């Protein structure tokens, strides 16, 4: 992220499909975390979402590089729940399978946590708190997403988001 105060990501590669312009009267009230179940780059996410009816606002790569895919003023299709989509920012994280478990790299975990903190500050959501203003995708849809972010790496992730 190039500027935490203004939420400027390292790169911008905006989707031209599979999101909704505006927020249908909603405003950003919380953050929804996701994992790629793959080691995708910003460009890789962009490519996948050209044919898959899904999107997210932000992608965090394995090396910590951040990318904006949908503007915050618009609705990404990420939570499987329209209210959640129109009232949140969706943040995707690259990860890898290690011993049959999806795991974030150190750089992804650190960058993701700092992006969450920056979003909470910018949108005046309060201190990042799990299940208060930071939610797993699985809270809104039947899914194991965001894997380790809601499991083995949750405490470290949320600690770094402070």
Question: What residue ranges belong to the model's regions?
Answer:
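Short strand-loop junctions, especially beta-strand C-caps/beta-turns
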Residues: 36, 94-96
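Basic/polar, cationic surfaces and motifs that engage anionic cell-wall
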Residues: 1-25, 96-162
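N-terminal catalytic cores of peptidoglycan-degrading enzymes
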Residues: 1-85, 145
